[in-house]
Amino acid sequence: MTIQECYASIGGDFEGVMSRLMKPSSVAKFTLMFPMDDSFSSLKKAYEAGEIRPAFLAAHSLKGMAVNLGFTDLYRAASIVTEEYRDGEVSDRIDEEMKQCEAEYEKVIQAIAAYAADRTDA
């Protein structure tokens, strides 16, 4: 699997991230580092504890990582969660929004794991 195929499997914006990082090897390097970021685990922990400010900060961080790496669907889901927490008032939609964010996160993590296990562009 190439890094382009990895991005295609998640509907990622490979061309957009290439415009920032310039080389497929750089895209691969930063993509492979993404699972080590703790933004999603921090978000989930804060969400489960009902901690609004930490949840906002973690969601905002996840959103930034996702947009910079071209993970479009994860970016959209994290953006919704970020806005949910922004003003400190959480609606009854948060459970469904978190489920969607987690599903998009897992999709990205699984694609990266598949890429890491079967790289053809290393």
Task: Show where each model-derived region lies.
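Long, amphipathic alpha-helical coiled-coil segments characteristic
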Residues: 11-61, 91-120
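Non-catalytic signal-transmission and effector/linker regions of two-component phosphorelay proteins
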Residues: 1-5, 9, 120-122
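Short, structured coil/loop segments at alpha-helix boundaries
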Residues: 1, 22-24, 71-75, 91
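Short secondary-structure boundary micro-motifs
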Residues: 1-4, 28-30, 50, 67
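Short, well-ordered alpha-helical segments
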Residues: 39, 51, 55-58, 66-86
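Alpha-helix N-cap/helix-start motif at coil-to-helix transitions, marked by capping-box chemistry
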Residues: 8, 33-34, 72-75
